[in-house]
Curated annotation (Swiss-Prot):
One of its GO terms (molecular function) is iron ion binding. Residues 1-53 form the Rubredoxin-like domain. This is Rubredoxin-2. GO terms for biological process: alkane catabolic process. The keyword Ubl conjugation does not apply. Binds 1 Fe(3+) ion per subunit. It comes from Clostridium perfringens (strain 13 / Type A).
Length: 53
């Protein structure tokens, strides 16, 4: 599964970890995160994330 980085603050979304504090279970791919999810650090939406290694 691919990781995605927030272009604003540098937060890295790792699908293996998810974002359980915000309702995203481990194992959830970025494309499967709800559209209303926002970066847990800076609050921008999914459109502000880019694929990373």
């Amino acid at each position: 599964m691919k990781k995605f980085i927030c272009d604003v603050c540098g937060y890295i979304y790792d699908p293996a970890v998810g974002d359980p504090d915000n309702g995203v279970e481990p194992g959830t791919e970025f494309k499967d995160i709800p559209d209303d999810w926002v970066c847990p650090l800076c609050g921008v939406d999914k459109s502000q994330f880019s694929e990373t290694e």
